[in-house]
Swiss-Prot record:
Keyword annotations from UniProtKB, A to Z: Germination, Sporulation
Signal peptide residues on this chain, from the entry's feature table: none
Induction context: Expression is sigma K-dependent and negatively regulated by GerE.
The protein's name: Probable spore germination protein GerPB
Biological processes annotated in GO: sporulation resulting in formation of a cellular spore
Biased composition range(s): Polar residues: 54-65
This protein's encoding gene: gerPB
Coiled-coil ranges per UniProt: none
Region entry Disordered, spans: 48-77
Biological function: Required for the formation of functionally normal spores. Could be involved in the establishment of normal spore coat structure and/or permeability, which allows the access of germinants to their receptor.
A Pfam short name: GerPB
Amino acid sequence: MNFYINQTIQINYLRLESISNSSILQIGSAGSIKSLSNLYNTGSYVEPAPEVSGSGQPLQLQEPDTGSLVPLQPPGR
């Protein structure tokens, strides 16, 4: 037997301390929550990462790219 529930919810103020990658924010009713995990290649990598040095020597770091593919909000507020 399936039940279909239609709800109208009005939220005037919602304060969240933190939400991480594995958090679920549920508002309303749900019979079941199905997990979903997506892995995206946002850096357009075409080969695996280099092997980690076992000698304990620090690895040479490259300069970070100054351009961002993700539009970020400017600091402030």
